[in-house]
Regions:
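Selective transmembrane helix interface/packing segments
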Residues: 1-389, 393-422, 426-446
């Protein structure tokens, strides 16, 4: 997007406009997503409790009930308890919402639809989502209420404890993929359903369930919602909030639910990739125009959204099915079960990846082809070479050299390539058995 704006305005202004457009789009995604998820939770709760749920506002299914509730909250009076810290009391809900919102900056909705592609996107999301607890603590501290303070203290202890096993679970797919870039991890899982990392080995399968348990606790959802236990703390840390500020806490909660579900979809369930292989939309973009590329990204986004909504629905189902735990039981689940299991899964994934890099399916994973994605003129050139080779047209020495150079670049990126080198694949001027010039240049650079 910055490249598009740079055609008409200076470079610094182009990047600023691109950042503003991304912020506006992401804010609407979080806000609209929260409205949809609130309506969905009401319908799920009604279904589990043998009720109908919203049925009056917006037709038979109550589509506009959440919007009506939002308008009601906007028109409500903003109250503040006597003795509260005015600055911190007003600031707390915005801190929680901003922390939840920032997680979407590095979350890819499709192969080409991501605000910022970060090399450490996994840990960026975990770091910014960990900041949400500061808003909860400030809300409890500044409300001048013992119920709010108890809720904030519970949330702090719970989030800090569950981030340890959750971080270890996230490292397992990162270790297998060899990258912390979420886009690269998603590209690695292209192809059939068996290429998804959850089916790589038994350890990743168990790791997903430990991750999802810890993620449910980190976003303060039942049965781990001790910070807002109605039977003990009235309403928890947001007891004294009303109106629009109260709604910011709920938008942050549902936004975090979608974010952790999206992270699980990328790390374990193929991200935007479907269960069946589809065409290489990047190659179609260069051969048939950008319309096919946009169509591919849109289909990938639909796959990603379906997986995220499935994860959010599972959290809602757990809330209305399982009873709330006591605070000592919540900490026991973390320290006695989740943390040791996550540590064992991490060690098991290390050993499995070292001795059996093919994974549980037995299929060789072409890391070099998946992690290396050519673009621009190089992608078009390699596409033409593939078409010529598939049609039986013999490739010249220059064509084979071009293909071998691209594979060498993929090896330098940390990928694997077990294809043997022959005399025709060497660059011109190299001696038999000597390292290519790119290898010598890389060694001298280091």
């Amino acid at each position: 997007m910055a490249e598009f704006f740079s055609q008409y305005v200076p470079t610094w202004l182009a990047y600023l406009l691109a950042a503003l457009v991304h912020c506006v789009l992401l804010i609407h995604v979080v806000a609209v997503g929260a409205l949809v998820f609130i309506w969905l939770e009401r319908k799920v709760a009604g279904r589990i409790q043998d009720r109908l749920g919203p049925t009056r506002v917006g037709g038979k299914f109550g589509w506009l009930q959440t919007l009506a509730d939002g308008l009601k909250l906007i028109t409500k009076e903003d109250l503040m308890p006597e003795g509260a810290d005015a600055v911190l009391f007003r600031l707390a809900p915005y801190i929680s919402f901003c922390a939840s919102f920032c997680a979407y900056i590095a979350l890819p909705f499709s192969d080409g639809w991501v605000a910022v592609e970060l090399n450490a996107g996994v840990f960026f999301i975990l770091a910014v989502m960990g900041l949400e607890v500061f808003g909860v603590i400030l809300a409890g501290y500044s409300s001048a209420s013992k119920w709010s303070l108890f809720g904030g203290m519970r949330e702090a202890a719970q989030v800090v404890s569950y981030e340890v096993p959750m971080g270890m679970c996230v490292v397992v797919p990162v270790l297998i993929a060899g990258s912390m870039d979420l886009v690269q991890i998603g590209r690695l899982q292209e192809g059939f359903l068996t290429n998804w990392l959850i089916f790589h080995d038994p350890f990743t399968f168990i790791t997903f369930w430990v991750y999802f348990t810890c993620a449910t606790a980190s976003v303060n959802r039942a049965p781990f919602d001790l910070a807002e236990a109605e039977s003990e703390l009235v309403a928890g840390f947001h007891t004294e909030y009303s109106g629009l500020r109260w709604s910011f806490f709920f938008m942050a909660e549902y936004g975090s639910m979608f974010a952790v579900s999206g992270l699980a979809a990328i790390l374990f369930f193929g991200g935007w990739n479907g269960p069946l292989p589809i065409s290489d939309w990047l190659t179609l973009t260069h051969e048939h125009g950008p319309v096919w590329g946009y169509l591919g990204n849109f289909l990938g986004m639909l796959n990603f959204m379906f997986k995220c909504v499935a994860g959010v629905t599972f959290m809602m189902w757990a809330r209305w099915t399982l009873p709330r735990l006591r605070i000592d039981q919540v900490m026991k689940v973390c320290l006695k079960y989740c943390t040791p299991i996550a540590a064992v899964m991490f060690l098991g994934a290390v050993v499995w990846t070292y001795y059996l890099p093919e994974g549980a399916t037995g299929a060789r994973r072409p890391y070099a082809e998946k992690l290396y994605r050519p673009a621009g003129d190089e992608a078009a050139a390699q596409s033409r070479l593939s078409l010529r080779e598939s049609s039986g047209d013999p490739l010249s020495l220059g064509d084979r050299t071009h293909r071998r150079t691209a594979q060498d670049d993929a090896i330098f990126r940390g990928a694997k390539d077990d294809e043997p080198r022959d005399a025709t694949s060497r660059q011109p001027g190299h001696r038999q058995g000597s390292a290519p010039a790119t290898y010598r240049e890389e060694a001298s650079f280091r």
